[in-house]
């Protein structure tokens, strides 16, 4: 249903439905955040059109050696082998890397959710094949959510997953990173 612009009113200016929300806001995006994690390697499983921005950002950061992708082609959407594509693609990448990363940030996309892809099976299989690597489930899904965490917030939480839980020690402090530039007020 179309709503003329002059009839759009807050808080629901448009009919609720599938909406797109860019995963990158401004000049800081999920690629930049993933690169903050030392020893990590990012793997994106998506179509070439989705990878464009990721590739450009990795190139801009001169971090092409910490980034790989598995390309989803049109036939992959219909052949019923999406889980195998992800598992074998990621496995191939890890076998070919000169040095295996300690952490793999594996980014799936909206198409995996639309298809009902069994992400638990994918991660369980990869973790059993590569027990020395920590796999972090990350998402590049620009499908607007009306509730819950945004993709950006999910990634920020996911970056802490590789850290083991420690006993509380009141004589220690924790210093966490931030991508917000602190400016001198003077």
For the regions a protein language model found, what residue spans apply to each?
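An N-terminal assembly and electron-transfer interface module characteristic of large anaerobic redox
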Residues: 1-186
């Amino acid at each position: 249903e179309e709503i003329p612009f002059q009839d759009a009113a807050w808080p629901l200016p448009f009919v609720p439905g599938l909406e797109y929300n860019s995963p990158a806001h401004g000049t800081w995006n999920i690629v930049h955040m993933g690169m903050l994690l030392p020893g990590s390697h990012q793997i994106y499983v998506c179509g070439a059109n989705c990878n464009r921005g990721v590739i450009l950002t990795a190139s801009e950061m001169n971090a092409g050696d910490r980034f790989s992708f598995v390309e989803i082609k049109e036939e992959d959407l219909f052949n019923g082998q999406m889980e195998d594509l992800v598992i074998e693609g990621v496995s191939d990448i890890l076998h070919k890397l000169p040095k295996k990363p300690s952490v793999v940030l594996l980014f799936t996309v909206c198409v995996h959710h639309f298809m009902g892809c069994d992400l638990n099976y994918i991660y369980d299989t990869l973790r059993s094949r590569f027990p020395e690597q920590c796999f972090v489930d990350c998402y590049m899904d620009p499908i607007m959510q009306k509730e819950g965490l945004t993709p950006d917030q999910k990634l920020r939480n996911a970056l802490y997953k590789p850290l083991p839980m420690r006993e509380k020690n009141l004589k220690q402090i924790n210093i966490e990173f931030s991508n917000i530039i602190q400016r001198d007020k003077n």
